[in-house]
Structures are given as structure tokens and as C-alpha cells.
Amino acid sequence: MTKQPNSNMDARISSTGCQESLPRTELDSHANMVVLGSECFVFDNILDQTCDVEPFDPTIGTAKRVPIVDAALAYDCPYSHKTYIFVLRNALYIPSMSHNLLPPFILREAGIKCDDVPKIHCKNPSIENHSISFPDSELRIPLMLNGIFSYFHTRKPTNEEIMSCDK
């Protein structure tokens, strides 16, 4: 039995020439918290907690009262054609952003292997390089580059996916 891509994968395949317009999650080694944009499913605004966020340049100003949320992202694996749901807790929510920021440090603290060195900088690159892998799963997420930023495509999951997909 041959697995067929789901509708989200079909859309991604048909839009190969316009990769930049697809929602994505970027690795950000300077962030100390996960930052989620508009393409996530917020399932809990933690007791209406907020915080003020200082940017890398103090002259830009502080983002005031940024909500802290629990939310989910969907990842459509191009190899298995399965959709995985990533649950992110205590994340900053900035809905004006079209992408998400994920600190590799936080992935590593959770026991997830994050190799953020691009393959062009590896002596003998393999599938393990420039990827995110999970110790208790066969899932491996290959990373891509947008300029110098490593990223992978994610999107807002549907209600049905929240209930039925692997987390």
C-alpha cells in the first residue's frame, strides 16, 4: 500500500517555487524562550500571564505585555507523510509574526538532538547533520537555510489534528 501525501503536503509540493511564503519555524540561538507567531494553535493563555520582552537593541523599545501561552505547531513529514503535533509550553505569543523562533538550547534541554550546523560546513555530511531528531521516535526533521537561518516548515494544526496526530 502506497502512502499518499495529505492535502497540506500537496500544497507544499505544488508551491515548491515559493518556499518563503510557507509558515516556518526558525532556530534562534539568541532567544531564551520559544516565540510563536500567527501560525500556531493556542490552546491555553496561561492565566492571562504576560511579560515585557527586551529586544537585542535597547533603542528599539520593549514589547509590552506579550502573552505567555501553551500552543501547538503541526509538522508534515515529507518522508512518512505523517503529521506530527509539537506542543510548546510557556511560549511568548506575538501574532504579528508570520514565523516562529525556537532556541536550540531549549530543544537540547528537552533531550532532543539539534544539529544546527549547515551541511556545507560538515566534512562528511549525512542525514544526521543539519537536522532535529527525537530519541524516542523515528522522526528526523531536515533543516533548510533561509540566508543564514536554519528553519523547517510548520503550520497551524487543525482541531482534528490536535486530537488525532502523534505528539
Show the residue positions of the predicted features.
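C-terminal reverse transcriptase regions that engage the nucleic-acid substrate
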Residues: 54-65
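Aspartyl protease active-site motif detector
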Residues: 8-56, 89-103
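Intrinsically disordered, low-complexity interaction arms of viral/retroelements
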Residues: 1-21, 27, 147-167
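Residue-level signal for well-ordered alpha-helical segments
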Residues: 2-8, 12, 52, 78-84
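Aspartic protease core domain of the pepsin/retropepsin superfamily
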Residues: 48-50, 64-167
